[in-house]
Amino acid sequence: MILRKKFGGIQEMYNIVSKLLIYGNMDEESILMQLSDIFRCMDEGSQTKDVLRTRVFKQVKRILEVATDYAFDKNLWHNYLTYLLITNENPFSITCEKVGASEGSVNHFAKSDFKAFKELFDFDFSRIEDELGVDCFSRISDYQAIGKPELMYNKNVSEKVQALSERLETAKDENEFFDMVTDFYKAYGVGMFGLNKAFRIEECGDNNIRFRAINNMDKVVLSDLVGYEIQKQKLVENTEAFVEGRKANNVLLFGDSGTGKSTSIKAIVNEYYDQGLRMIEIYKHQFKDLSNVIAQIKNRNYRFIIYMDDLSFEEFEIEYKFLKAVIEGGVETKPENILIYATSNRRHLIKETWNDRSDVENSNGMHRSDTMEEKLSLVNRFGVTINYSKPSQKEYFEIVFELARKAGIKMGEDELKLEANKWELSHGGISGRTAQQFINHLMGLQA
């Protein structure tokens, strides 16, 4: 049957949401917009109970899906609203990211929106539940989530959303709401870049790209990398200058495979995330999109490392030209909030051939030595180059001893040496990676 009776207060959610100005840029298919429309239809009596109940269940299911993705617990409605607030990129929130709120007329509009969100936080669903004969909103207001392994969700996002949600529950009015939300923007930022440490890029047609968060980045820190203290210190000094707004250089980490080059960069991102450092991993075939990537991040209040792993070029590859163009810059000044950190097994990045060494002119009238110089000059565009060389056998054993100690492996040094030596002979030779794989093997045996 069609509901003809007007239920006082039910349309209130629609009225609240319709007042949003700065945060009103939500898609019509978003959960909040759909719920507000459901309650409007209910108040107008334009749909049957069965239709309204089905629509309500659909949106509650979507809230549960968001909660599952981020391992939300307790009040899922509050968690969802908080998630909206800290992922909504608008002129106000972006201005506040990493610097906080400033005096200005926009604060009046923001507080008006936060008053609406405060009303949504306190929204009473009981009348709707009574009329439709459901209890789903009561259930998600005190939800007991099933425990999930960390690899199945983004723990960083989960913890931040739930912590802010619990704070917002205590806000007395829109002024306290304003302070709490803008404090969050100052501490972490807003949207995808505020909540995540690292990203990859994806092509999405028409020469456009979008960023995809890396949800479960390795939690490694620099102290986990045994040895290489000089190398780590050089990387730290350059990165600290960068995040503090001082002059810093692009960095090339080169050397033997398995020596900790990639691990060092991941560790740097983990250690300086709270200071606004973010990483965007880009592959060689995506270098054509570099200018597009830079255009999308240059005006954000973060420090971005564009990370290129295992960087090298064969003689016939020309992608290095895109990289050189970005590093050198053109008419436009290179943004100060972007650096390139790359790893490579090659010191000069581009394979040099005997033809390159010849000074015979090619068909284009250029000396081959000029071509070689153009290729090899790429490495000079990195202001800091750090050599990660293969450890000596003594250093290899020291790495094994330290990793064994951290792992709680009870084995004498002589036996460790003997077994570690056997392992490296059949597993690719001496390196930090080989040492870690050996320790993983021992840990598996102990289990």
Language-model segments: what does each one mean?
Residues 1-166:
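Intrinsically disordered, low-complexity N-terminal extensions of AAA+/P-loop NTPases
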Residues 212-240:
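N-terminal pre-Walker A segment at the start of P-loop NTPase domains
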Residues 246-265:
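Walker A/P-loop nucleotide-binding motif
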Residues 271-304, 311-316:
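AAA+/P-loop NTPase substrate/partner-engagement loops
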Residues 361-376, 383-397:
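Conserved AAA+ ATPase "SRH/arginine-finger" region at the nucleotide-binding site
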Residues 385, 389-447:
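C-terminal alpha-helical "lid" subdomain
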